[in-house]
From Swiss-Prot:
Ubiquitinated; STUB1 likely mediates polyubiquitination of PD-L1/CD274 triggering its degradation. Ubiquitinated by MARCHF8; leading to degradation. Deubiquitinated by USP22; leading to stabilization. The keyword Repeat applies. The gene is CD274. Induction: Up-regulated on T- and B-cells, dendritic cells, keratinocytes and monocytes after LPS and IFNG activation. Up-regulated in B-cells activated by surface Ig cross-linking. It is linked to Truncation of the 3'-untranslated (3'-UTR) region of CD274 transcripts leads to elevated expression of CD274 in multiple cancers including T-cell leukemia, diffuse large B-cell lymphoma and stomach adenocarcinoma. Disruption of 3'-UTR region is caused by structural variants that stabilize CD274 transcripts, leading to overexpression. Increased expression in tumors promotes immune evasion and tumor cell growth by allowing malignant cells to escape destruction by the immune system. PANTHER family: PROGRAMMED CELL DEATH 1 LIGAND 1, T-LYMPHOCYTE ACTIVATION ANTIGEN. Keywords: Adaptive immunity, Cell membrane, Disulfide bond, Endosome, Glycoprotein, Immunity, Immunoglobulin domain, Membrane, Nucleus, Receptor, Repeat, Secreted, Signal, Transmembrane, Transmembrane helix, Ubl conjugation. This is Programmed cell death 1 ligand 1.
Amino acid sequence: MRIFAVFIFMTYWHLLNAFTVTVPKDLYVVEYGSNMTIECKFPVEKQLDLAALIVYWEMEDKNIIQFVHGEEDLKVQHSSYRQRARLLKDQLSLGNAALQITDVKLQDAGVYRCMISYGGADYKRITVKVNAPYNKINQRILVVDPVTSEHELTCQAEGYPKAEVIWTSSDHQVLSGKTTTTNSKREEKLFNVTSTLRINTTTNEIFYCTFRRLDPEENHTAELVIPELPLAHPPNERTHLVILGAILLCLGVALTFIFRLRKGRMMDVKKCGIQDTNSKKQSDTHLEET
């Protein structure tokens, strides 16, 4: 505010010099997270004399740029603009005091003042509005009850200002969903809007969730297509391995049993053969004695 008071004095002091600052636009509407450049024009004849130029940019009570006699003083820059705001010095020779702000925040909205002294002095106001659209909509579809084919549809997005969510079917019927609004964890002023719809439906049916914001008026819509119901017990690689292991185990047990059974039979046959031989020998011996 002290800088602004000094410039008012300088403006009246140099009125006779007819030094005038102009602005190509006095209103900028920019998107959250984007980069913006706002401009103030001042008269330059022939070659620019940096030693005679003073440029100030401020927003309400925040100092953004203080450029005096060819040097920029970053020590006075407000902390919220550090590493984000800069004066485009290559534009000064063209009579353009352009302020560039990167990664625009919601708190960057407000009234900016450019104050320029160059032989004379003048200032202009520029209004900046920040728009945070609900254009990145996350969606989810869950099966609540496979028997009744009840599904839970969810849409979630962040933006500013607040928005309502309207659910519609493919035949444009408006449906009743439940919407909750909380503050975003990314930035204090952003709203996190989540809406849920529970409905009995069938495969390939289409539903729409629309985020409607009134000021400024803007709509963003996401399409949700109902997928096929999953199998009650979907096969997977682990199941296949378990089944294969069980089959191999059973096969191993069966082969072992068969092998032992055959071995036992062979032993019985061999024993029978030995017994027959012994019996025959005993018979022959008995005959010889007789």
